[in-house]
Amino acid sequence: MNSIQLIIDIILILWLLILTVLYLRKKSLNLNIVKNKKIVRAKRYIVFYVIAESKVKGDDLERVVRNSLKDLLGNVWLNIANPKVVTYKEDTQEGIISTNRIGYKAVLASLPFAKEINGNKILIVPRRTTGSLKKAKKLIGLK
């Protein structure tokens, strides 16, 4: 009985030793992987349209989007997301907001808080989020 227990203990110790070696090898391999810089700089484009009482200008729209993000989450998230209105068609009141991969959800969350431009009530409605500017322009009818 005692010898059977000794054999089981030795097998368990060997098994744990093998698992430990495999784990440490895998961990050392992961440390040598260089992070992909393209992922860090990946952009997201939010296609939106504006419902307003009268026509809205693109410059005013960018200011309101940035202020709504600042009011909702503060200066830190404003600097992280850095939203910019890339394209805005005043006739159809459609446009594209450019942001990064980290902050696009913060920008989406702050859009309903943009309620007024120069005394004019507005509502910014996001239609779609894409990863390429070409597809975003195609969605609003450019090129």
UniProtKB/Swiss-Prot annotation:
E.C. designation(s): 3.1.26.5
Tell me which SUPFAM superfamilies the record gives.
Rnp2-like
Q: What's any GO biological process attached to this entry?
A: tRNA 5'-leader removal
Q: Name one GO cellular component term.
A: ribonuclease P complex
Keywords in alphabetical order, please: Cytoplasm, Endonuclease, Hydrolase, Nuclease, tRNA processing
- The organism's superkingdom is given as Archaea
Would the keyword Amino-acid biosynthesis turn up in this protein's UniProt record?
no
List the GO molecular function terms: ribonuclease P activity
Reaction catalysed by this chain?
Endonucleolytic cleavage of RNA, removing 5'-extranucleotides from tRNA precursor
Q: Where are the transmembrane segments?
A: none
Tell me the enzyme class. hydrolase
- Chief place of localization: cytoplasm
Keyword S-adenosyl-L-methionine included in the entry's annotation: no
Q: Where in the cell is it found?
A: Cytoplasm
Family to which this protein belongs: Belongs to the eukaryotic/archaeal RNase P protein component 2 family.
**Functional summary from the UniProt entry:** Part of ribonuclease P, a protein complex that generates mature tRNA molecules by cleaving their 5'-ends.
How it assembles, according to the record, is: Consists of a catalytic RNA component and at least 4-5 protein subunits.
Q: What is the official name of this protein in its record?
A: Ribonuclease P protein component 2
- Which species is this record about? Saccharolobus islandicus (strain M.16.4 / Kamchatka #3)
Lineage, broadest ranks: Archaea, Thermoproteota, Thermoprotei, Sulfolobales, Sulfolobaceae
